[in-house]
């Protein structure tokens, strides 16, 4: 079983955790329907970049 030789400092702990921050997902608003959607994804109505791409 692995056992640490020395206790990691607060600085090293912080350096390790520096990449753990959560980021918010970028959301766009469609030109035609005004609906919010994820970037590079179609809206729930089937619009992408102002054009109807899926007919429901």
Swiss-Prot record:
Single annotated GO MF: structural constituent of ribosome
Segments of this protein annotated with the region Disordered: 1-29
Gene Ontology terms describing biological process: translation
Keywords in alphabetical order: Ribonucleoprotein, Ribosomal protein
Pfam family for this entry, one: Ribosomal_L32p
An annotated GO cellular component: large ribosomal subunit
Domain of life: Bacteria
Alphabetical list of PANTHER family matching this protein: 50S RIBOSOMAL PROTEIN L32, LARGE RIBOSOMAL SUBUNIT PROTEIN BL32
Family: Belongs to the bacterial ribosomal protein bL32 family.
Protein name: Large ribosomal subunit protein bL32
Organism: Pectobacterium atrosepticum (strain SCRI 1043 / ATCC BAA-672)
Taxonomic classification: Bacteria, Pseudomonadati, Pseudomonadota, Gammaproteobacteria, Enterobacterales
Gene giving rise to this polypeptide: rpmF
């Amino acid at each position: 079983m692995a056992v640490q030789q020395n206790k990691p400092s607060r600085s090293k702990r912080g350096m390790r955790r520096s990449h753990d921050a959560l980021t918010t997902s970028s959301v766009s608003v469609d030109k035609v329907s005004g609906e919010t959607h994820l970037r590079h994804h179609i809206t729930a109505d089937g619009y992408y970049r102002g054009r109807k791409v899926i007919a429901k």
